[in-house]
């Protein structure tokens, strides 16, 4: 499928794809995500239409908490709804994300991931904001580059409607959100062809309506709450396959090979890095360099972070691997092992795994990462 090329940053790429599936956008600006709702507002003002033939209704609220509450209200009323945020703004949305996920509503929260202020303010990219949402019940999809943001944002929207779960669709703040690239851009006709319109209608039919009222948001005692809460397990079990289904639709249209976990590197790799986000592009260069020197290394790129599919991870890792390094772009004080232990428990690996915190070091080329990373691979994982 031929697509036109345009020059844009990650925020605009996300906004372009999000606008196609959005009927209501509830917004509030916060760096570095502000450009996304600015584009949506600009396009709506200009009369641009989504795939449903409508102009997006944009409402700016008083805060991110208000934007999340309006998202909840809009999605309950049957409108395909998006919002855009980062960092402390995302934290203000957490109470409503719990509700939206618990009620099985397909809202999409587009996030340019940014450090959460702790001892000091930091507006640059890490994953501390999205990690804070891991137990909300929202599915979480990550992109590594501007092109991936364009390609995979539709997957979040299509899978949300099909699988009846909200999505946090995220990419690295500044490193991806503000990186300007010449990329291939979706045509809205192709995006309309990708979504299951019957699922969209099914979602709309369940909307709150005074003509056919129904009860929701009841208070339950522990015995009933436990039972009904466990009932959602099958939804999460089925979501990875649903996400892969829409990745396959993207692959069929674009000739790509997007998977829940993509492997890059030597087929007989003995050392592998598992990482998520913009660092993957640098690691790919590092892998090429090291393999050219005779080493056997590879990279597993995490795309669907929640629900986490152990089966897909195991399938992505070559059988020859002896050592695994897991890059974690968040400091979690008090935790033990963090993402390394998740890989271990999810994959059935029973060898010693130690965490390596991926910090904000300014190196951007493979030589720098090689120098810093190989010592970790060889010494911290002996």
Region locations from a protein language model:
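Glycine-/acidic-rich phosphate or pyrophosphate-binding loops and their flanking alpha/beta elements
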Residues: 7-13, 248-271
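Short, solvent-exposed amphipathic alpha-helical segments in soluble enzyme
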Residues: 41-44, 98-101, 157-159, 184-187, ...
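Conformationally flexible catalytic loops at phosphate/diphosphate-handling active centers
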Residues: 52-56, 167-262
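Redox- and metal-dependent alpha/beta enzyme cores, enriched for Fe-S-associated oxidoreductases
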Residues: 267-295, 308-315
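Peripheral docking tails and interdomain loops at the edges
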Residues: 323, 327-382
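Conserved thiamine diphosphate
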Residues: 123-173, 197, 346-357, 367
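Thiamine diphosphate
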Residues: 1-132, 137, 154, 173-174, ...
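A general structural motif
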Residues: 119-123, 242-258, 275-283, 303-309
